[in-house]
């Protein structure tokens, strides 16, 4: 399991820095292209959670795939959850020895 110290880039950060700003696209123009309210795009840019239906529309508007966007969201969700529950996980009793542990012994 790979653990990173820094939180992965969010969908909103990726959208703003790699797509909207370099391409000169406003959040209003993107919302219109996607057929969603501009608050939907604004919420994403400001750290809101991406849903599958919005990922499909976002991908269609920007010419990439829903998986691209959902993978970014998944990485953030997993990082947040792992960091929130890492102390609790220490008390879980493994049912099986992992391959990684068995290689060390």
From Swiss-Prot:
PROSITE patterns: HTH_CROC1 (PS50943). It comes from the Bacteria. GO terms for molecular function: DNA binding. Induction: Induced by amino acid starvation. Induced by the protein synthesis inhibitors chloramphenicol, kanamycin and to a lesser extent by spectinomycin. Pfam families: HTH_3 (PF01381). Residues 27-46 bind DNA. InterPro entries: Cro/C1-type_HTH (IPR001387), Lambda_DNA-bd_dom_sf (IPR010982), Toxin_antidote_HigA (IPR013430). The keyword Membrane does not apply. Gene3D superfamilies: lambda repressor-like DNA-binding domains (1.10.260.40). Residues 15-69 form the HTH cro/C1-type domain. Keywords: DNA-binding, Toxin-antitoxin system, Transcription, Transcription regulation. Signal peptide: none annotated. PANTHER family: ANTITOXIN HIGA-1 (PTHR36924:SF1). Antitoxin component of a type II toxin-antitoxin (TA) system that counteracts the effect of the HigB-1 toxin. Binds to its own promoter and regulates transcription of the higB-1/higA-1 operon. HigB-1/HigA-1 has been shown to stabilize plasmids very efficiently in E.coli. This is Antitoxin HigA-1. It comes from Vibrio cholerae serotype O1 (strain ATCC 39315 / El Tor Inaba N16961). The gene is higA-1.
């Amino acid at each position: 399991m790979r653990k990173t110290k820094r939180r992965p880039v969010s969908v909103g950060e990726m959208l703003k820095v790699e797509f909207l700003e370099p391409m000169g696209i406003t959040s209003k123009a993107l919302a219109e292209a996607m057929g969603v309210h501009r608050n939907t795009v604004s919420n994403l840019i400001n750290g809101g959670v991406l849903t599958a239906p919005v990922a499909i529309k976002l991908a269609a508007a920007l010419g990439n795939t829903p998986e691209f966007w959902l993978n970014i969201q998944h990485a953030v969700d997993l990082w947040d959850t792992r960091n929130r529950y890492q102390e609790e996980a220490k008390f879980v009793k493994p049912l099986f020895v992992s391959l990684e542990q068995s290689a060390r012994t």
